[in-house]
Design a protein with these regions (language model features):
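Active-site-proximal polar cores
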Residues: 1-19
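Short, conserved turn/kink motifs that form compact alpha/beta structural patches or helix kinks used as
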Residues: 14-105
Length: 105
């Protein structure tokens, strides 16, 4: 688990918001199965939680989240995550999104 900030892009390459404070933690194997991510390794699936309420541009399925502080250890580039499940919003308090880490590209 780590805390960082992410940039929200939709569609890929079009930044809509930067500096979204989030917590990123590894998802369980059951979470990956729930999404039916064929071929996804369990360590490529993560839960991302917003830490400072719901962003001005709320997260939604297929959004790309780019880590503004941490690099992907395999590529040396900023870590990138695709929102793959339905995003849950909790009374304007925060959002939770199941994401798959994008390797390379």
């Amino acid at each position: 688990m780590h805390m960082t900030t992410v940039r929200l892009e939709r569609p890929e390459g079009t930044p809509l918001q930067t500096g979204i404070a989030v917590q990123i933690e590894a998802a369980s194997a059951q979470d990956a199965e729930r999404l039916d991510l064929q071929g996804a390794r369990t360590y490529d699936v993560f839960w991302i939680y917003t830490l400072e309420g719901v962003p001005d541009v709320p997260l939604r399925r297929r959004d790309l989240l780019v880590d503004e502080r941490e690099n992907d250890p395999e590529t040396g580039l900023p870590a990138r995550y695709r929102v793959t499940g339905l995003v849950e919003t909790f009374a304007g308090d925060h959002q939770e999104a199941l994401c798959e880490r994008i390797i390379g590209g």
